[in-house]
Amino acid sequence: ILKIILFVMLYDLKCHRLWWGGDILNKIFGTDGIRGIFNKELTVDLSMKIGKAVAHVLAPNSGKIIIGKDTRLSSDSIECAIASGVCSCGSSAILVGVIPTPGVAYLTRKNRANAGIMISASHNSFEFNGIKIFDRNGYKISDEIQRKIENLIFSDFYDVSFPIGDKVGSIKQEKGYMTQ
C-alpha cells in the first residue's frame, strides 16, 4: 500500500499523468515520440493540438513543416489533423505522403523546413500509431522542446493568438519530394 501511495500512475484518454510527491507531470511524449491506440490515446483532437503546438514552437511566423506517414489506416486522419493544426498557426504543411521515417528527417533538413513530422508506430501492431517530430536539422527534438509542446497542449493554448484571413497557412501535396 505504501508503494501505491508513493507512486500512482493515472491514465486518461489523451495522456499519461504521473503523480509523484505531490507534483503532477503531464506527459504526452514517450521514449521516441508520441504513441498510442488511434481514437483512444492518440485522437484526431490531440493530433490537431500537436500540429498547432509544433508550428507555434518550431515554425513561428509562417514557417514550413514537412509531414510524412506510413501506410496504416489511421495515418490519413492523423495527417489531416496535424496539417490543420499547423495551418491554423500560419505555417505551411508540406505533405510528402508515404515515406520511411529517415526520409522525413532528410527532407526537413534538405528543404530547410522548420520541422518535420512523421506519422508511424514503427513495429507496433496496426491499431497503434505514433508521431515523431524532427527539428530543422532533421534530428529528434530535445526534451526541452518536448516540454514546450506539452505545456502548450495542456494549457489549451492559453495566451496564444492565431492568425486570421490571409495569414493562415496552406497545405501543399509534394509527392515529388521522394525523388530528392
Map each language-model feature to its residues:
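An N-terminal, well-structured beta->alpha segment
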Residues: 22-84, 88-89, 167-180
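Generic structural "secondary-structure junction" signal
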Residues: 31, 36-40, 44, 101, ...
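Ferredoxin-reductase
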Residues: 55, 60-137
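Gly/Ser/Thr-enriched, mixed-charge loops and adjacent short helices
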Residues: 131-180
